[in-house]
């Protein structure tokens, strides 16, 4: 779990930024309901991620094809887990709220890698480079109202899991959103992303901590 993380982002006032797959990992049939049809952008830590929330941010950009200029992220992640075919998966899921619109990287998701270059505080420059191999199934960006996501998961998708704690996760998301709406931000950190050209990144000053 310490090497796996995801980012559940909310666009104001109450829309969730998610991924939608057309087929399952196991089997090629197209269906209206299967495990992880709707999913949270997430992935595994790599050698460039200094902190686990950097894994969450990097995977969000790689999988959605979008990035944020300004966001408030709750600093305590939720440990989301589910069981599939006897294997239990665990991810540290960070929940955040985007200020303003998401920016488009202009590339198809998962066709590039993202490197985060840290600056002051949690300000990052992001560098995109082409990916030589892609083993991910095709997923598209989907942005839906929070309650619609909760209702869909509860009525259509949770019964595809042998077990999970998604119900507790939904309560956690509601709690984080309530704190944000009430301007109780002491447990949030502000993060910003700025895309730069790989050649420009080489000329930029080193990270500031």
Swiss-Prot record:
Domain of life, per lineage: Viruses
Pfam families with a match to the protein in the record: NUDIX
Residue intervals of the Nudix hydrolase domain: 1-167
Family matches, as SUPFAM superfamilies: Nudix
Signal peptide: none
InterPro entries associated with the record: NUDIX_hydrolase-like_dom_sf (IPR015797), NUDIX_hydrolase_dom (IPR000086)
Protein name: Uncharacterized 24.3 kDa protein
Natural source organism: Orgyia pseudotsugata multicapsid polyhedrosis virus
Upper lineage: Viruses, Viruses incertae sedis, Naldaviricetes, Lefavirales, Baculoviridae
